[in-house]
Each structure stands twice: as C-alpha cells, then as structure tokens.
C-alpha cells in the first residue's frame, strides 16, 4: 500500500491516507487528478509520486495553494498572516513531525488562548487559574475538583444536548461564562439544539497548564504553511493549476483516478441537499506595537458580535515587528458562495451524509479525502 505513513495534523484536523487500499501495482504509469491544493491533496500527490510511476494534475479554485492553511506575508507589516484563521501544527506521532520538518523548519510554539468575559480576561482551556479567577478563590486541584462537583447538575443523568452535557459536568456558572454565548455565536443556534456529542469531554484542567494543545510535537513553520506545501509539489511530474474550479459533471476521463478533497455534496451537485456548515468572515485591522498581547482572544459574551481576535505577530515570536495586524472573526451560516469551515453534523446532516457516502462508494475511479470530503471537523 502506498500511504502507510501519510499524515498531516493541523489543529484538530488529521489527514490519514492509510485507508486508501490501492496497491502499488495498480498505480504504475498512471495519470491522476487531485482536486484541491491543501494539505490533503498535496501530501497525497507527493506520496503518489514518491511511491509510483505517475503524473499528477492538481486543480484549485483559489489563486493560491495551501487551502485554509494558506499563509502569506502582509505587505504593510511584513508579518506572516494565517489568511483563513489560526492553524497550529500539532501531533503525537514522530513520523508525522519528521515528515513535515523535511519540507521546512518548524519552531516551537505554545498556543495560549485567553477569553474575554464580562470585561475580564481569563485563561483557556478552563483550568485551575480560570476557576480561581472566576470564583475569587485560591483552590488547590483537589479543592477545585470537589467544588465543581457541587456545581454540576446531577439531576441530568443522560444529557440530550450540548447544554445539558455542560451543565451536568461543570454547572451553570462556568457554562454561562465561557460556553453559552460563544457556542451560540459560533454555531448560530441555541446550545440546546446541538448534540451532546460536540462536547464529549469538558475541557477542564485541575492545574495551571494553559497550553491549548497536549501534543508532544507542536510548532509553526518559519516560512509559513504555504512554503511547506509549495515544496511538497515542486516536482516535474506534478502540475498545479490555480483558479480552476471543479464543476460537477466535468470530463475527467483523461485520468486513471480522481482524488477529491472538496465538499462531498459538491461533487454530487448537492442533489440530496447541502450539508450544514458554518463559515467565518474576517475583518482586518492594523495598529502600532502590540494590540492584545496574545495570539488568540475569545469573546464569550453573546452581545459581542465577533467570536475571537487573532493577532498574527504572536505566531512568530522569533520575529520583530513595529506594527501589528489582527483579525476580528465572525461566524455565520454557509451560503452557496461561502467557504465551508465547520461541519454542523446535526441529525439531518448525518442522514444526508450517509446518502452521499453510499453514492461515493459506488464510484470506482474516484476517492474522497480530507476534512471537507469526509465531512469532519
């Protein structure tokens, strides 16, 4: 099999091509089309070329490679900007870490998120410092754990939705402060309308660890993610065509196989309806010096229209910049012309996905991979 060690881990996204059970014998002297020049498509292209005798065309509808991980230098400040929101590379697998580092230098980075709530700044994920701040206490870990147990709503024995799941384990005080307003803004509905599975494990730490990620390997590429992806496809037998949008029904008969990394419902021209997504928009601001002192500040209050502010200079703390650039991020329902970000995965979406998957399994010359094609967060 060609893809036993192909992984990419960006935030919560892990591409694992190990499920593609295509023998090397069937991949010799072939021509392939990959739709999408993000991490999924470009890692796949690199591994196909490395392990087989083939030529590859990659199409992407945008004017750049990198997908939502695209990074670029801001012309005004010189700061490396995460164009579609923050992405931190994190993994526990050494083979993944070694793989990406073979295409560019990564430097250590600890992602520390702060939260603005009722005019005060707190530490996230919810940890011992957060609990002591919110309640004006100086609990030890054991005391904090015992205290939260008194706040938990034990009358909820079988949580049926997001809100019940939160109230069952952390109580209304922490829920109202850090989860209710933010969740409502991010998902565009009441938390009671969201499945409990979204909040499978309440992110509460009974220590002062405020590192957002627990992974062994975490870092930021010195030359940005787009620099890494550019090197992945710098091979004569890989041809990347930008500003080329895939349209359902396009003739792909010139290719032995097509690998699709776009939304699975788009491949089928939304014939059963659109899968539910939330998208985000960004408002760009410039300032002198340092705006907020951290990479990411979440705004938990419902009356603040944006969900978070990302200040990009803090991703690369080894660089020095006199000015700063930051994004205010707004969440909204995904329209036909919007970029899909977060799958809603409500019950109606799961039913719809099952129908698309059944159709996808019937396609012998097409494979679906990546977060959009598999409808995963």
Stretches found by the model and what they are:
Residues 32-57:
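N-terminal Rossmann-like FAD-binding beta1-loop-alpha1 element of flavoenzymes
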Residues 118-123, 128-257, 261, 268:
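Active-site/ligand-binding neighborhood in enzyme catalytic cores
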């Amino acid at each position: 099999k060609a893809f036993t060690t192909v992984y990419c881990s960006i935030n919560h996204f892990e591409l694992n091509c190990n499920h593609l059970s295509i023998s090397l014998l069937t991949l010799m002297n072939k021509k392939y089309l990959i739709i999408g020049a993000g991490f999924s498509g470009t890692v796949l292209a690199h591994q196909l070329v490395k392990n087989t005798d083939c030529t590859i065309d990659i199409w992407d509808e945008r004017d750049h490679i990198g997908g939502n991980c695209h990074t670029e230098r801001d012309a005004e400040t010189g700061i490396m900007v995460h164009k579609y929101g923050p992405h931190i590379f994190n993994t526990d697998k050494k083979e993944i870490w070694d793989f990406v580092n073979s295409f560019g230098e990564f430097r250590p980075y600890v992602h520390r998120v702060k939260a603005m709530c009722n005019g005060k700044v707190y530490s996230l994920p919810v940890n011992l410092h957060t609990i002591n701040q919110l309640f004006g206490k100086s609990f030890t870990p054991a005391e904090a754990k015992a205290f939260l147990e008194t706040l938990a709503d034990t009358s909820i024995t079988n949580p049926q939705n997001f809100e019940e799941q939160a109230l069952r384990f952390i109580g209304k005080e922490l829920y109202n402060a850090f989860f209710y307003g933010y969740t409502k803004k991010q998902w565009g509905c009441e938390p009671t309308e969201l499945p409990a599975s979204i909040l499978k494990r309440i992110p509460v730490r009974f220590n002062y660890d405020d590192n957002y990620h627990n992974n062994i390997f975490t870092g930021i590429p010195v030359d940005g993610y787009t620099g890494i992806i550019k090197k992945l496809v710098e091979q004569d037998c890989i041809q990347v065509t930008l500003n080329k949008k895939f349209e359902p029904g396009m003739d792909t008969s010139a290719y032995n196989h097509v690998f699709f990394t776009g939304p699975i419902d788009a491949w089928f021209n939304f014939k059963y309806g659109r899968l539910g997504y939330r998208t985000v928009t960004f408002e760009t601001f410039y300032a002198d010096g340092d705006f907020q002192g951290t990479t990411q500040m979440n705004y938990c209050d419902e009356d603040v229209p944006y969900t978070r502010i990302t200040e990009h200079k803090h991703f690369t703390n080894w660089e020095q910049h006199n000015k700063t650039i930051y994004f205010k991020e707004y969440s909204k329902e995904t329209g036909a012309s919007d970029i899909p970000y977060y799958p809603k995965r409500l019950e109606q979406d799961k039913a719809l996905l099952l129908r698309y998957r059944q159709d996808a399994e019937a396609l012998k010359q097409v494979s679906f991979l990546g977060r959009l094609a598999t409808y995963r967060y």
